Amino acid sequence: MEKVRDDGIALDFEVGDEVVKIINVKSSSLPCPLLVFSPTTEGSYPILLFFHGFRLQPDSYKSLLLHISSHQYIAVAPKFSLMTSRCEVKTAKKVAEWLSAKKLNSVLPEKVFPDIQKVAVSGHSRGGKTAFALALAYGSGDSKGESIVTSGRATRKQKQPPLKISALLGIDPVAKGSSCFCSSNILQYIPYSFNHSVPVAVIGTGLSNRRAYGVCPPDAPNGVNHAEFFNESKPPCYYFLAKNYGHTDMLDEGEKIMGIMKKKGKKETKHDLRRTIGGLFVAFFKAYLEGQADDLINIIESPGIRCPIKLDPVISIEE
């Protein structure tokens, strides 16, 4: 049964009760450092593998990842250096291999264990594209190794490592931008064309397709943004649009990023957006990692009551 506040907002949108430990991980067996958010209570917990946006770092998402982890999930956020999108996907695959080898166990608090059978992947901006690319490589379950990684075409790869991805979420994903570092495109512009077998949630922002200050290119241009990622996802898939917010409004306060920000004069705050995204993650995880779909169903049916901000539209495609 869904738990709600007195005003009807679901408790998934509030910080959970779990005490979270933040762990910086550097290892010769890793292709890059990690920022890990771990519950501290004894037990086994699902894993979120989260990829940051272009020119950002996991520290920019601390509030969001703390929110998610406080509901008893382990969040693993690689710290990518400045690299091409193709190299970023390759690095993400190496981190996934590290997880599948159960090496995360050694860095977690005592008696805290990762449930490698319950893994979700996600990311923001170009990190969202990286998450989709990883799921397209591993999510099809093709033991022969057929995968779609960065070009939008099916290519034969080596046998994939045994990492089961159970859920995929994109926060304002961007497939291709003005930078040469984001030159490849996984989109095919065919509905339901992504070759994956995992449930998908796409969270978009309504202002991310606009020019910043009337001069700078949009952060998430039409045709390569959240709408097209959702359009190409196979059911079950979900779409949530935070229409009054911009591409970087979910970052922690103090992040100085050029781009369109939220509309002024609205009662909603950036903190409310972070709460909303965190709550959507938690509800989606409950549904597809733990088999408890009540929260997600109620949010979809009554977003105006259950959510801290206006989500419009909210779309659910089950089959």
Residue ranges and their predicted role:
Residues T41-G43, S69-S70, V112-D115, V121-R126, ...:
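Extracellular/periplasmic catalytic domains that process cell-envelope and extracellular macromolecules
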Residues M1-G43:
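N-terminal cap/lid segment of alpha/beta-hydrolase-fold proteins
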Residues K234, K243-T248, D252-E319:
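Alpha/beta-hydrolase-fold serine-hydrolase catalytic core, especially in secreted/extracellular enzymes
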Residues S44-G53:
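Short beta-strand element of the alpha/beta-hydrolase
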Residues L56-P78:
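Short amphipathic alpha-helix adjacent to the substrate-entry channel of hydrolases
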